[in-house]
């Protein structure tokens, strides 16, 4: 896919993964999204698995500019690079916008 992948979060550390073409409601179990977060400059990767359309708890600081994420489980492995973080009220509501690389 060449579509933008949006990793949306509401409240710190609660992340929901979805994209424009395949909404969470359209995904049927057991479709599972596997998210691997690689910190910039090296360090240990963090891996999370969640059923499509669900929320999961991520470690603080995982989604910051420069982190590289790998998302798999819908159609194919998607390698994405975080290109921006939009912070909302109280810096607890935020949206991570990623795209394929």
Q: What are these language model-derived features?
A:
Residues 1-101:
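Contiguous segments within soluble domain cores/interaction surfaces
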């Amino acid at each position: 896919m060449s579509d933008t992948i949006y990793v949306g979060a509401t409240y710190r550390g609660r992340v929901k993964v979805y994209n424009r073409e395949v909404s969470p409601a359209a995904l049927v179990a057991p479709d599972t999204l596997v998210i691997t977060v690689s910190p910039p400059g090296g360090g240990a990767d963090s891996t999370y698995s969640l059923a499509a359309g669900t929320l999961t708890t991520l470690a603080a600081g995982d989604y910051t500019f420069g982190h590289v994420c790998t998302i798999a489980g819908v159609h194919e492995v998607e390698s994405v690079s975080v290109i921006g973080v939009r912070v909302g009220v109280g810096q607890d509501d935020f949206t991570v916008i990623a795209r394929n690389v």
